Amino acid sequence: MDRADIVHEAFLARVSAGEFPSGDAPYGPLSGFEAVAIFRAQCLSRNLDRRSRKMQSAGQGFYTIGSSGHEGMAAVASALRRDDMAFLHYRDGAFQTRRSAMVPGTTPAWDMLLSFSTAKSDPLSGGRHKVLGSKAMNIPPQTSTIASHLPKAVGAAYSISLAKRHPPEHKVLKDDSIVMCSFGDASANHSTAQGAINTACWTSYQSVPLPLLFVCEDNDIGISTRTPQGWIGASFANKPGLKYFKANGLDLFDTFCVAQAAAEYVRKRKKPAFLHLSLVRLYGHAGADLQQTYLAKSIFEEWEQNDPLLHSARLLTESGVLTADEVLSIYIETEEQCARVAEEVIQQQRLSTSQEVMASIVPPKRECKLTNGPSEEARETAFGSDIQQMEKPQNMSRLINWALTDLMLEYPEIIMMSEDVGRKGGVYGVTQKLCDRFGQDRVIDTLLDEQSILGLAIGLAHNGFIPLPEIQFLAYFHNAEDQIRGEAATLSFFSNGQFTNPMVLRIAGLGYQKGFGGHFHNDNSLAVLRDIPGVIVACPSHGADAVKMLRECLRLAREEQRVVVFVEPIALYPMRDLHDEKDGGWMHTYPAMDESVSLGEVGVTGNGPLAIITYGNGHYLSQQAAKVLKQQGIEIRIVDIRWIAPLPAEGILSAIDGAQKVLVVDECRGTGGQAEALFAMLTERSDLPVARLAAEDSFIATGPAYAATMPSRESIIAAATKLWNTL
């Protein structure tokens, strides 16, 4: 017999016989009415788990990682307000069923079963995935098994007090809300969880408000690996700035009492707390997990003896709230409800086409207040003496600084965050004076942890802010890429566009820094960004474009709720000259306030029959090469694609109309570089002869060989000449 059926039959038999596991007497402030509501949610969650397994075995359901053994989370839901944002562990079905009962109009059994069956009418994901979550219940969807939702929970909690001082237009959380995030004991060991909890402690230690409740659901095992006894308590009980609470998660009275105290502490003190619940795991990790292959039978039989529903039944009967017959009636009623609803659910349509699946990758547009831009008085106050320099040509670094200033003046919901972004003004000085102009609330110096930086941004976006996080160097993004790839980029997809986290992520990157940094400060690979569905990647090549593209990126985030990555070529920050020393050929005046470059709009210079398609540093070098090639009788047109993703195919094809040959110049590596996508597109949609010049598949060296592996003016000239002379 399946373990789920064994536990089910044991529950019915033991309640009927009055044979309950031992435990403490019921105590605390939990009312009988609330206790019954919690138990009903527990029973519903349990029977949803059982039904999901039956659906899966019949080919009608597609998810069997259940919440059985973790039903104590229903008591945690009761201890919180329904408007407290909750980032849930994947075993928190009971939390959702309990909160659902607190929100009028929700139908937990129907909704969860629709999710199990991946029905198009699933109210959260639209049939794309089985995820816990609900817009009405303030539960953003989570699918993570590695605690990657903890960093954004920290960010969301941080946003609450920030929103009091700087109310964003699209504010979500109330001023006295708290944020809850839950995770398993195994996930607590993951670097992402460790980093997020450390960030919460670091923040709280400095008396910065952070109303966040961590809930660790400790069932002593992660798939097959046991958690050392006492490990969670020893690890988290004495963290600076973090209050530790411990409860028996099998006891709904104890769990409610302690969870209520923890929530009250967080809400009143505006400090983070860690609620440690002792639980059991029933049935194994998932339906396909045969726990008997790695656990002694006596171990999981002991867990089954401690079934939390049996503990709840004992407590409810001992306290006189319910009789044994009433306990069984609730359990059987929810079982029959799940069976009845499942028969209806399996008749629902499922997604079948790529268009249907992809429909929610790009989030919906939203209504935003119209603005007239910052006033001249505000600009004069903010810029000071800098405003006198705006009519003179400047390098990219200064122009980006001015663009950020104007944007922050116009949109008070913009918040910047990174290591050294504030008082220092950034490693390259791009954010100089911004902290003085807008204060430490809006230009935040963070601790050194890229996952926490991006998590802070995602969390702020959940509460209506427009975050502008910065990653100091492109190579450092790899430390935290899942925060974009697995979290930010998937939110609209998994919520059918109901939840969004718009942002503009600035990354200083690419190569060609003279004699500085080697690989870790010069990374010429954008592959990690290019294939993330829905993410926009921009890369300006000079200051004027940087300003105009940054304005468009901000608009895309604010109005279209997009996740945008803005890659700033480090080597071009200070670039002044193009061909000759002091020619000022790569400096530009500050663009007028109404100027921008639209998504997909490419830049074109020249109209020669040989087209060079490039971006970033490649554009700069191609301009140098074009001058020499012209002297040799080869006329060039240069197409700066500007937008790395999505590839601006229509703009590129229009720009090369009339050309005879095409050379793709890619400063990124030959393997995984942008040239691969360009070559594929041109092969599919154009008959022109095409060649490419890309960087070697190599890391970047420090010292005189800093550019040896990447395209140069000379190599572009040689490649263009060879292509042009090829019949």
Question: Model features per residue range: what roles?
Answer:
Residues 47-50, 54-212, 223-241, 519, ...:
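Cofactor-binding active-site loop characterized by glycine-rich and histidine/acidic residues
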Residues 81, 91, 99-122, 144-145, ...:
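A generic, well-ordered mixed alpha/beta core segment in the N-terminal half of proteins
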Residues 1-73, 78-80, 283-438, 448, ...:
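Conserved acidic/glycine
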Residues 71-74, 138-351, 422-501, ...:
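Thiamine diphosphate
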Residues 514-610:
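Phosphate/diphosphate-binding glycine-rich loops and adjacent basic-rich segments that engage nucleotide
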Residues 54-59, 128-143, 175-182, 240-244, ...:
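Glycine/charged-rich beta-loop-alpha catalytic/anionic-binding loops adjacent to active sites
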